[in-house]
Amino acid sequence: MATAMQDVSPSFTSSPTSTMTTISTTTAATAAAAPKPDKPRKLRSACDACHRSKTRCSGGNPCTRCHEYMSPCTYSYSSRCGKPKGARSRKTLEREQRVAAAAESARIAGNPSALASLPATSTCTSTATTAAAAAAATTTTTIATTTAPSQGPAVDSAAAAAAATTSTVASPRADDCLGLFDDDEESNPFFSSGSENTGGTSFSPDWIPPLPSISDSDLSFPLLESCLGPDHDCNDSLFWSTTAEPDCQPTSKEPLDPRSKLLRSCKCLQTLSSLTARDIRRFDATFVFVRNYARAFSAFYHCSHCPKDAGSISMAVTALQLATTALEKTATAGTDAAGFKSGCSGMTAADLDEDLLTPGAEFFLPANGRGASNPAFQLGSYQIAPLPGEPDLEEHSEILNILIRSAVRRLLAVCWQIWDLLRGPASRDGRGHVFEPYDPSSSSSSSSSSFSSGPEIHQLCDLSCSAEAAQFRSTLVQIPARLCNLLAL
């Protein structure tokens, strides 16, 4: 007897996995062989008459409605349509397979030693896929019982990698329906690090307003110190982003004088001209105006049909001055809101006409004197204002600071593009133009070139000696300085 026990005990304890597999297989076979008892069908809680008329039934036989109308009160069985409970569709299985494949690739990328076991991993993946399809058909759970204990940590790590991948892909600005931000701003050091001399704060996506990150064709303006310095890299992706040539054709094939027929020459000029005649009535419209102007000028800059003459560039500079003035008023609204509110009553109609805020404008001023440093701003359907009882909330100024920095970046990029257009014909890329009377050859320019070296402020004095160029030169020297002053507010 003792010998028999010694022979049986080792064989019983040596293969727990095979024993669990046998038990699971037997249980699954028994469950599959035994037919499931049909659940008793339930009667509707409403009678047939109330069900057809879609009215509330009081229940009973007869119900109140059938008793009132003296009609027969009968109850029928409810008919259930659709898939049975727990069934999964083909698209659900495909989505789960894609998630599992992404988790596996993330695990392999994070663990280089796993590359040696790639065939085994592929086998496990295909086995898991086949098992998932079988589970959807038979709704049994024998796969979970037959899984080896050593595969548990691998499955947990794959699930964790899938969760990390999903959280990484999610954008903190998925609801930026106004497109006030760019995709490259998050990785730009100009917005990702604070500046001591400008008083800027660190760029943190945790408190950014839920304003898609719509990728537009604006040029990315890099860090100011790196641009104006001698060691900047113009081939960096943060310096200029590649922009495709817009599909813009002239409305007429005959050569048009842009000075007399400006609006007939190109769609880009029409858009730019409409921006110069626009009146910015509200502070929150400033950021939208800057975005639209930067996009319109970028299309004009890269369009091969738009004439790059004095009239076109003068129109662009006018819109740039309008955007800069509006941005200055928006940036200083917090410090000057109290004085502006007290002085509105003494302003005349002429004063209001000269200001960007016209009498029909909706003034975005603080609700009380304590909130003078944090005026309310409305961006689309989002209201950015200090909470009641907390007028000195720092998040409001942080959000406004990020929006102002984004607008400054766009306008500085426009300044650099205008400088590129003002360069002489001896420039390295051939995009420069001389301000002479109308020259038909100036109506086309290369759209794929970009200047190879960043301009400096003192180089703006080397432009043409014409009156138009002198005026543009003085403006382009002043506007970047005004924009840089906004970063110190």
Curated annotation (Swiss-Prot):
Disruption phenotype: Impairs the expression of the majority of genes in the gliotoxin cluster with the exception of gliT. Residues 9-20, 441-451 have a biased composition (Low complexity). Its main location: nucleus. Induction: Expression is induced by gliotoxin. Expression is controlled by veA. Expression is controlled by brlA and abaA. Expression is also regulated by rsmA. Expression is also influenced by SfaD and GpgA. It is found in: Nucleus. GO terms for molecular function: DNA binding; DNA-binding transcription factor activity, RNA polymerase II-specific; zinc ion binding. Residues 1-20, 188-207, 432-451 are annotated as: Disordered. One of its GO terms (biological process) is mycotoxin biosynthetic process. Gene3D superfamilies: Zn(2)-C6 fungal-type DNA-binding domain. Residues 47-73 bind DNA. Residues 189-203 have a biased composition (Polar residues). Keywords: DNA-binding, Metal-binding, Nucleus, Transcription, Transcription regulation, Virulence, Zinc. One of its GO terms (cellular component) is nucleus. Pfam families: Zn_clus. It comes from the Eukaryota. Transcription factor that regulates gliotoxin production and contributes to virulence. This is C6 finger domain transcription factor gliZ.
